[in-house]
Regions:
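N-terminal targeting signals for export/organelle localization
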Residues: 1-52, 173, 189
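Extracytoplasmic
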Residues: 44-46, 67-68, 98, 143
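A short beta-strand-turn-helix
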Residues: 48-71
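A generic structural signal for alpha->beta connector loops
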Residues: 69, 100, 125-126
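Short pre-active-site segment immediately N-terminal to redox-active cysteine/selenocysteine motifs
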Residues: 69-71, 75-79, 144
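Hydrophobic beta-strand anchors of alpha/beta hydrolase catalytic cores
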Residues: 72-73, 103, 148
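Structural microenvironment flanking redox-active thiols in thiol-disulfide oxidoreductases
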Residues: 84-122, 132-139, 176
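Thiol/disulfide oxidoreductase modules built on the thioredoxin-like
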Residues: 117-125, 131-182
Length: 189
C-alpha cells in the first residue's frame, strides 16, 4: 500500500512537471486583429533591453533596433528540444524577411562560446544574444521556452507565442503575423 502511494505521488509530480514544461502553442490575439497580431491600440510596450551579441560582443539596444524594423525575439536554449526543432524554421523566416524584419535569438542558459558553436553547427545566421542573467527572459515572462515575441517599430509587443507544436506550421503562422504587421505599417503614415 505504501509503495502504491509513493508511486502515485511520483506519477503526479511527473505529470505536473510535464504540464508545466510541455510547450503548448498559444498566441494572444485581440478581437478584430489580423491572425496572430494584437491590435495596435491594445499592444503593450516592449521591455527595453541591451544585450551582447554572442558572436561579436557588441551590444544590441532593443528599442533602437525596433525603430529600424519589426523584431522577432526567440527565447531559447540549446538543451531545449522544442527550441532546437523551431530554430530551422526561424532561420528560413529570417532569410525570407531579410531587410524587413530582424530576428534575434535570446539565449539565457548558454555561454557565448557555446551559443556561437551551436549556431555554426546548425547554420543559424541571425544574431544570438546572451542573457545569462535571465533578466530579459524574465521581464518578457518567459516561464517556458521557446517563446516568440514580435515587436513593432513603435516598440510595442504585437504577438507572443509560447511553445512549439510540431503539428503546426511555424513558418506559415508566423509569416501570416509578420505579413499582417508589415501591411499595417505600410498603411500608417
Amino acid at each position: 500500500m505504501n509503495r502504491t502511494k509513493t508511486l502515485l505521488a511520483i506519477l503526479l509530480v511527473a505529470a505536473a512537471f510535464a504540464l508545466l514544461f510541455t510547450s503548448v502553442r498559444s498566441s494572444k490575439i485581440a478581437d478584430g486583429a489580423a491572425p496572430g497580431l494584437v491590435a495596435a491600440g491594445a499592444a503593450k510596450d516592449a521591455v527595453d533591453f541591451t544585450l551582447a551579441d554572442a558572436a561579436t560582443g557588441r551590444p544590441l539596444h532593443m528599442k533602437a533596433a525596433a525603430r529600424q524594423s519589426p523584431l522577432v525575439l526567440d527565447f531559447w536554449a540549446t538543451w531545449c528540444g522544442p527550441c532546437r526543432a523551431e530554430l530551422p524554421h526561424l532561420q528560413a523566416l529570417s532569410q525570407k524577411y531579410q531587410g524587413r524584419v530582424a530576428f534575434y535569438g535570446v539565449n539565457s542558459s548558454d555561454t557565448p562560446p557555446n551559443i556561437r558553436a551551436f549556431s555554426k553547427e546548425n547554420g543559424l545566421t541571425f544574431p544570438m544574444l546572451s542573457d545569462t542573467q535571465h533578466s530579459v527572459a524574465f521581464s518578457y515572462g518567459a516561464d517556458s521556452i521557446p517563446l516568440l515575441v514580435v515587436v513593432d517599430t513603435e516598440g510595442r509587443v504585437r504577438s507572443v507565442v509560447s511553445g512549439y507544436d510540431p503539428d503546426e506550421n511555424v513558418e506559415t503562422s508566423l509569416s501570416r503575423t509578420l505579413d499582417a504587421l508589415l501591411a499595417e505599417q505600410r498603411k500608417t503614415p
